[in-house]
């Protein structure tokens, strides 16, 4: 459960990300593909090379979904319902991959915003990403 302080940190972080969301999303995806090569199996039709237009486009989709989630912290299930359906019923993404991408996104954010990435912000973002992952995998059951 996200506290009011957690929510404030999450919203403040997403405000700081601003127009860099797509860039950070793509970088997090690249990190995920490099560190956890099995995640590439879900993207056989993508050019997964550094700077690929397809990875950049998907990174923007990831960032946009997280921005939507950050704007609807009090009702993540409704905000992410369509995305949950897509990942559970059509794409059938292994739930562990959400945790791997979340980890790589935290690393990316820490690398770009080291001063703002305090232990409290790290913890709050980790809780947020875990909540998003839980919602995205809720329809697998």
UniProtKB/Swiss-Prot annotation:
Q: Which residues bind O2?
A: 58
Instruction: Give the sites modified to Phosphoserine.
Output: 3, 49, 102, 131, 138
Instruction: Please give the function described in this protein's UniProt entry.
Output: Involved in oxygen transport from the lung to the various peripheral tissues.
Instruction: Give a yes or no for keyword Phosphoprotein in this entry.
Output: yes
Provide GO CC annotations from the record.
blood microparticle; haptoglobin-hemoglobin complex; hemoglobin complex
As stated in the Swiss-Prot or TrEMBL entry, residues carrying the post-translational modification Phosphothreonine are: 108, 134, 137
So what family is this one in?
A: Belongs to the globin family.
Which InterPro entries does the entry mention? Answer: Globin (IPR000971), Globin-like_sf (IPR009050), Globin/Proto (IPR012292), Hemoglobin_a-typ (IPR002338), Hemoglobin_oxygen_transport (IPR050056), Hemoglobin_pi (IPR002339)
Q: Which residues carry this modification: N6-acetyllysine?
A: 16
Q: Where does this protein hold heme b?
A: 87
What does the entry give for GO biological process?
Answer: hydrogen peroxide catabolic process
Q: Which residues form the Globin domain?
A: 1-141
A single GO molecular function, which one?
A: haptoglobin binding
**Keywords recorded for this protein, A-Z:** Acetylation, Heme, Iron, Metal-binding, Oxygen transport, Phosphoprotein, Transport
Q: Disulfide pairs?
A: none
* Keyword Oxidoreductase among UniProt keywords: no
A Pfam family matched in the record: Globin
SUPFAM superfamilies for the chain? Globin-like
What residues bear N6-succinyllysine in this entry? 7, 11, 16, 40
Protein species of origin: Crocuta crocuta (Spotted hyena)
Q: Which tissues show it? A: Red blood cells.
Subunit organization: Heterotetramer of two alpha chains and two beta chains.
| Name assigned to this protein | Hemoglobin subunit alpha
Phosphotyrosine PTM sites in chain numbering = 24
């Amino acid at each position: 459960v996200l506290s009011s302080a957690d929510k404030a940190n999450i919203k403040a972080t997403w405000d700081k990300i601003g127009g860099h969301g797509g860039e950070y999303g793509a970088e997090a995806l690249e990190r995920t593909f490099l560190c956890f090569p099995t995640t590439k199996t879900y993207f056989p039709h993508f050019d997964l090379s550094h700077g690929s237009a397809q990875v950049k486009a998907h990174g923007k989709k990831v960032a946009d979904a997280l921005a939507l989630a950050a704007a609807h912290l009090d009702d993540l299930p409704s905000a992410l319902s369509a995305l949950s359906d897509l990942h559970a019923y059509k794409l059938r993404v292994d739930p562990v991959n959400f945790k791997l991408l979340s980890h790589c996104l935290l690393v990316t954010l820490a690398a770009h915003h080291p001063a703002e990435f305090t232990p409290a912000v790290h913890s709050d973002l980790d809780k947020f990403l875990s909540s998003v992952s839980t919602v995205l995998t809720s329809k697998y059951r």
